[in-house]
Regions:
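Active-site-surrounding "flap" and adjacent substrate/cofactor-binding loops of secreted or lumenal enzymes
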Residues: 1-8, 37-62
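Short acidic, glycine/Ser/Thr-rich loop/turn "cap" segments at secondary-structure junctions
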Residues: 11, 25-28, 60-65
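Solvent-exposed loop and edge beta-strand segments that line ligand/cofactor-binding
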Residues: 11-20, 64-72
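Generic structural hydrophobic/aromatic packing signal, biased to beta-strands
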Residues: 13-16, 46, 79, 99
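Alpha-helical support elements that line or immediately flank enzyme active sites
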Residues: 16-40, 77-86
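Active-site cavity-forming subdomains of large catalytic enzyme subunits
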Residues: 52-122
Length: 122
């Protein structure tokens, strides 16, 4: 089941239930070094979730639901760390577009949860 409550087929493994706020600093770098293919699948799972849920990256997904807990925008850092530490079986430009959307467009969201609350004030 996708983030839009529809059934989807993917060409890669799909992962869900991410606590990005807790894991983006160190765990992602470690798993990218140890398991780059699986980490690439995790990165693309975030991208697919964003595409299906409003265009913005999620930050804390539980059972395919963006919970909206915690502050900040950890997923772009997670994606950058994954790439820097070896998870690269995807087009990084695609991910960069999603990162920029969340950083530059007020109202960017994931299942109605704003990617960067207060962005309009900046």
């Amino acid at each position: 089941m996708g983030a839009d409550s529809q059934v989807h087929k993917t060409a890669r493994k799909f992962y869900t239930s991410f606590s990005n706020w807790d894991t983006y600093r160190t765990q992602t770098a470690l798993i990218a070094m140890l398991a780059p293919e699986e980490t690439s699948d995790i990165v693309m799972s975030h991208y697919l979730f964003a595409e299906q849920s409003g265009g913005g990256f999620p930050r804390w997904v539980l059972a395919n639901i963006e919970t909206g807990v915690m502050q900040g925008d950890p997923t772009p850092i997670l994606v950058a760390n994954a790439y820097a530490f070896g998870a690269r079986t995807y087009d990084p430009r695609t991910l960069l577009r999603t990162m920029r959307y969340g950083a530059e467009v007020p109202g960017a969201n994931s299942q109605g949860v704003l990617t960067r609350p207060g962005l309009e004030q900046y």
